[in-house]
């Protein structure tokens, strides 16, 4: 079969020979005599079928070279796809990483001399160091784009409370990463960093950022009851209980010192915790509003057991409360910040406070209508009273400094 196929290939036209150049070349190189050897026939048959003969070196690798010679092996190796050698990941030791980070803190783009020196120092190739710096710069750009809050050396983490206080303070450095050697390409605004920290962690930055936090410390208890240094050590609930105890004890011994406790100490009842307190503490705020409104009405409140001793002596408390109301009107007229709430509460409270001086003997009639009204307006009137009392306290502290000197 191989010999007959060889004869047919010789008789093919020129177009067929061009279509099968390998076969033609192999046939031409085959012995020309009719008595072809079996090996030549096998070569021709395999070349026609597309296979690579074992004895033909020109067709190795499937190349279509028209001439097969000794150089065909080199050409086949050049065109053959070369397999890339696999390189495993480089494992850096802690010493190498430390030295690389130090170099990166000095500069993000080290020159070739620096890389070679570092390579000799830590035992790596210069190419590995160059690739590490490329990856490190990419990581740094990503962290810079996301923001400082995701940085591994984050000064805004909740765990670093001491660092948080220094960052939020006035002595904030322009770049919080300067102590680590990191240079930012963009200018870092200190005020922006403080605002960002205050926005993300208000529980850590409320006291240093808000100046009114210092006033909140002195709202815990009246100034004549606690020294200024210990005012911030009392919680709202404990100061409220101590205020009630002092209010029940002070009027019996020194009734003249009682009105300042009402006027100056009452802002303790309107801290934000008491405004948004749970239902057990909301009646206390209602009693506080009643306690501010009934000093001139003088009868003891029927539903407030802690405040019963406050109004036991209506004849003694009425003049001082009138003086306190006059001071309240004077202080509210001096404070321009909250004119509308003060005007509303002043126009609302003197209507109840003016009639009692004419009929101090029968206290029950005006007191009968007050508790329902206090209960109805506890959500709005109490807030207005608290705002007015806060302004009054600030004004009294600004003028006198102590609540004992207000009435005297």
Swiss-Prot record:
It comes from Drosophila melanogaster. Residues 287-296 have a biased composition (Low complexity). Keywords: Developmental protein, DNA-binding, Homeobox, Nucleus. The gene is al. Residues 50-82, 258-313, 331-379 are annotated as: Disordered. A motif (OAR) lies at residues 378-391. It comes from the Eukaryota. Its main location: nucleus. It is found in: Nucleus. Signal peptide: none annotated. Belongs to the paired homeobox family. Involved in the morphogenesis of proximal and distal pattern elements in a subset of appendages. Also has a role in early imaginal disk development. Residues 85-144 bind DNA. Residues 297-308, 353-369 have a biased composition (Pro residues). Residues 331-352 have a biased composition (Polar residues). Disruption phenotype: Flies display a reduction in size of the arista and scutellum, a reduction or complete absence of the tarsal claws, irregularities of the sternopleural bristles and of the wing vein, and a bending of the wing blade. InterPro entries: HD, Homeobox_CS, Homeodomain-like_sf, HTH_motif, OAR_dom, Paired_Homeobox_TFs. The keyword DNA-binding applies. Gene3D superfamilies: Homeodomain-like. GO terms for cellular component: nucleus; protein-containing complex. SMART domains: HOX. This is Homeobox protein aristaless. One of its GO terms (molecular function) is RNA polymerase II transcription regulatory region sequence-specific DNA binding. One of its GO terms (biological process) is negative regulation of DNA-templated transcription. Expressed during embryonic development, in distinct epidermal patterns in head, thorax and abdomen and in an endodermal pattern in the anterior intestinal tract.
